[in-house]
Swiss-Prot record:
It catalyses: a fatty acyl-[ACP] + phosphate = an acyl phosphate + holo-[ACP]. Homodimer. Probably interacts with PlsY. One of its GO terms (biological process) is fatty acid biosynthetic process. Its EC number is 2.3.1.274. It is an enzyme of class 2 (transferase). This is Phosphate acyltransferase. Keywords: Cytoplasm, Lipid biosynthesis, Lipid metabolism, Phospholipid biosynthesis, Phospholipid metabolism, Transferase. Pfam families: FA_synthesis. GO terms for cellular component: cytoplasm. GO terms for molecular function: phosphate:acyl-[acyl carrier protein] acyltransferase activity. It comes from the Bacteria. The lineage of its organism: Bacteria, Pseudomonadati, Pseudomonadota, Gammaproteobacteria, Cellvibrionales. It is found in: Cytoplasm. Belongs to the PlsX family.
Length: 333
């Protein structure tokens, strides 16, 4: 890897258009002098934005005429959209012209293209989608979030190893790992979970903390929570929905009458701190763990602040050598 870290950005695939990625890249470069970013997308739109934002010698542009839309079938996109901004961004990793890639595009297409071009690490059966979740103290890493619907016990064990490696890269010396289940008792759950539990219990490369229920995901009792992609995605979407529901209810209640508005004014400093701590933008950027280079999936409707955080995740994974750490972890088993 070169001394200057290089990030390829799919500038076209997000819901809000290329302006978000362009502004985020410009601002992110101002904070990191050892970084270069290549924005990939329609040349005319990128050049127009370039003229508005000014020149930066560490910001580059690569023309890609096509775009992978959210409606595109992943396999169809893989076969027919090799001139898209998503494909060309990943191609920069494949050609060793970038160290990480960030895209806000179609998750299935991004995963299919990444597996085709970047390949998985030796010993990794399938990549998993992983995201940091805000908890009472710090974060907990939850995986898989949708890449693998039907998994066996060996794959869950592999997810645990990858999640533990990511937690170590974030500074957790001895990661605590749990399996998501419908109960904490050892006899609860499917046969796959029972078999996976045996594998995790016998692995001394991390601390296995037993089963964890969904209502304790945010307690901060463990550092890594492992599950199949179906249940992980349901847990993630449910938590996002509940968070938005609570925020909306608080806003409505504080506007109900004069007294509640006074209470809102008095509580504003506390509410502001809480809003900042739980701001989804601070946790944007899901990782495709198990690939040979970091590929980060930004939320499709990410604003500039959220996209900057996805860039931060990409930068940290390169700096902390996350793929290499995963490979080292897997090679011991």
């Amino acid at each position: 890897m070169s001394a200057t870290i290089r990030i390829a950005v799919d500038a076209m695939s997000g819901d809000l258009g290329p302006r978000v990625a362009i502004d985020a890249a410009q601002n992110f470069l101002q904070c990191h002098s050892d970084l270069e970013i290549t924005l990939v997308g329609d040349e005319s739109q990128l050049q127009q934005a370039h003229s508005l934002t000014g020149k930066n010698s560490r910001l580059h542009y690569l023309h890609a005429p096509d775009v992978v839309t959210m409606a595109d079938d992943p396999l169809s996109a893989l076969r027919h959209k090799k001139n898209s901004s998503m494909w060309k961004s990943l191609e920069l990793l494949c050609l060793d012209r970038a160290d990480a890639c960030v895209s806000a595009g179609n998750t299935g297409a991004l995963l299919a293209m990444a597996r085709h071009q970047i390949k998985t690490l030796p010993g990794i059966e399938r990549p998993a989608i992983c995201k940091s979740m805000p908890v009472r103290s710090g974060v907990t890493y939850l995986l898989d979030l949708g890449a693998n619907i039907d998994v066996g016990p060996e794959l869950l064990h592999q997810f645990a190893l990858m999640g533990a490696a990511l937690a170590r890269a974030a500074g957790v010396a001895n990661p605590r790992v749990s399996l998501l289940n419908i109960g904490t008792e050892e006899y609860k759950g499917t046969q796959v979970l029972q078999q996976a539990q045996v594998l995790l219990q016998s692995d001394n490369s991390f601390t296995y903390s037993g089963f964890v229920e969904a209502n304790r995901i945010f307690n901060g009792d463990v550092d890594v929570i492992v599950c199949d992609g179906f249940h992980g995605n349901v847990a993630l979407k449910a938590s996002e929905g509940v968070a938005q529901f609570i925020a909306d209810k608080i806003a409505v209640e504080f506007k109900r009458h004069v007294f509640s508005r006074v209470m809102a004014f008095l509580a504003w400093p506390t509410l502001r701190r809480l809003k900042l701590q739980l701001n989804p933008a601070r946790y944007n950027g899901a990782s495709f763990l198990g690939l040979q280079k970091p590929v980060i999936k930004s939320h499709g409707n990410a604003n500039e602040q959220a996209f900057i955080h996805a860039l931060e995740v990409a930068l940290q994974q390169v700096q902390e050598r996350v793929p290499q750490r995963i490979l080292e972890q897997i090679s011991l088993h």
